[in-house]
């Protein structure tokens, strides 16, 4: 049951109307992350799911991208997210994105200070891609936590 308003368990967007200015800004940020960033789809999805697992957000965990199949993303890709360090179906670039996202969500100050990680990260990603990854993780972490804390849309399954 939603902690704000009286929205059904599968309504993931109605609550934004309570705060139209901020809700509209969040909508624009969401659109930018999903439609204008430069992350390869598999990189975006592994990072998104690593944050979703950390947030325990049912909406995020149940969301899929309709163009995923064309990018080689199937349910096995999603089933092994918690095994990002070892599952052979992920590339080194995808593992690095998953590590970034996981640590962004669970231990951000240690991530900041880990020079070995940053050296590995820069082997795979340009500053532009890293910026897109960081901003995307910020959206997923913040929005996922809001949805979870306010118990909004937790039975909703989305296709992007």
What is each stretch, according to the model?
Residues 1-45, 65-69:
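Mobile cap/lid helix-loop segments that border enzyme active or cofactor-binding sites
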Residues 23, 61-80:
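Iron-sulfur (Fe-S) cluster-binding segments and ferredoxin-like electron-carrier domains
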Residues 40-46, 77, 95, 129-132:
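Alpha-helical scaffolds flanking conserved acidic
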Residues 44-67:
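Short, thiol/selenol-centered motifs that function as redox-active sites or metal-ligating centers
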Residues 46-51, 81-82, 97-105, 133-144:
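Short alpha-helical scaffolding segments that buttress acidic/His motifs in well-ordered protein cores
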Residues 83-90:
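Acidic/His metal-coordination segments adjacent to aromatic residues that form catalytic metal sites
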